[in-house]
């Protein structure tokens, strides 16, 4: 088994200051991993950690430098285009990217998304929707969804409350209802478990073949009982493992996952199989 983490932020040591600054400015109770063997590191250090933990691929949010929202500048924690390009070139197959689309730029933003999706490292787009105060069914997103439908790539979005001081209502999972109907072949991943609207997120994943639930940002001990039960039974083909690193460390999350005692089939689907179905551009695994 080779783990795929569907959502990480930039992991370079210099990004620690950006997290510290954002937390200090907003005064929010958000923590990031600080232990040296599970926190920020350089590319070679992350690959060594991935090899140790059995992780095949990290999917990294990647975007341009621009301010998002009133208090939070999300771009400070994502990879830059050139960083993603360098990671992908130096460590083929280990790092791929989700383009952090900006719906405020109109057609220029759509063209930038199109340019990003033409890159070898791109496997989909990411919507940090709270930064833009737009629900998932906002008209500004539809051209980006259409590009993803054309390119057969996934859309990942932070669902639920915002970790920063931004409007949370726009992250309600029910907002995916109309886009999932309009783009039936496009995979949509409701990240962050949809908390506090977990039942609503699960309902969307149950209703639509193309809607999935992602666990990023919450370590397994903090998953709602509903998420655990969904992953174990009705949603075994619908739940993706993620960390939103550095808010959750890989070593930390994988150790806690063992405590839930999922059977082998559920574990394989959550850690790898479901992600490989959602992200069709992931490197194909060699079968020995």
Regions found by a protein language model. Give the residues of each.
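Catalytic pocket-lining loop regions of alpha/beta-barrel enzymes
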Residues: 120-124, 134-240, 286-287
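Histidine-centered divalent metal-coordination motifs
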Residues: 4-13, 128, 158, 192
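Conserved, mostly hydrophobic/aromatic
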Residues: 7, 50, 84, 125, ...
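Active-site gating/metal-coordination segments in enzymes
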Residues: 56-57, 62-66, 70-157, 161-163, ...
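Active-site environment of divalent metal-dependent phosphoester hydrolases
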Residues: 11-14, 65-68, 103-107, 132-133, ...
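Generic structural signal for well-ordered alpha-helices
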Residues: 43-47, 81-88, 113-114, 141, ...
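Short, acidic/polar
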Residues: 41-50, 105-116, 198
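Mid-to-C-terminal alpha-helical segments outside catalytic/metal-binding sites
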Residues: 1-6, 13-57, 236-238, 248-288
């Amino acid at each position: 088994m080779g783990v795929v983490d569907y959502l990480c932020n930039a992991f370079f040591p210099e990004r620690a200051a950006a997290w510290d600054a954002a937390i200090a400015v907003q005064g929010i109770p958000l923590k990031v991993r600080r232990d040296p063997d599970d926190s920020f590191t350089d590319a070679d250090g992350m690959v060594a950690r991935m090899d140790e933990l059995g992780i095949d691929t990290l999917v990294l949010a990647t975007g341009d430098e621009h301010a998002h929202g009133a208090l939070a500048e999300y771009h400070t924690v994502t990879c830059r285009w050139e960083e993603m390009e360098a990671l992908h070139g130096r460590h083929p197959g280990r790092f791929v990217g989700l383009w952090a689309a900006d719906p405020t730029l109109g057609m220029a933003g759509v063209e930038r998304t199109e340019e990003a999706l033409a890159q070898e490292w791109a496997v989909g787009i990411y919507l940090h929707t709270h930064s833009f105060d737009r629900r998932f069914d906002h008209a500004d997103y539809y051209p980006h969804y259409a590009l993803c439908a054309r390119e057969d790539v996934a859309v990942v979005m932070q669902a639920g409350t915002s970790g920063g001081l931004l409007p949370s209502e726009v992250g309600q999972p029910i907002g995916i209802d109309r886009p999932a109907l309009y783009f039936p072949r496009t995979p949509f991943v409701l990240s962050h478990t949809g908390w506090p609207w977990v039942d609503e997120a699960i309902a969307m994943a149950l209703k639509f073949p193309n809607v999935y639930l992602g666990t990023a940002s919450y370590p397994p001990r903090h998953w709602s009982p509903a998420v655990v039960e969904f992953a174990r039974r009705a949603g075994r083909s619908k739940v993706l493992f993620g960390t939103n690193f550095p808010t959750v460390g890989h070593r930390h999350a994988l150790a806690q996952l063992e405590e839930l005692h999922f059977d082998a089939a559920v574990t394989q689907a959550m850690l790898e199989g479901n992600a490989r179905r959602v992200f069709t551009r992931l490197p194909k695994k060699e079968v020995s």
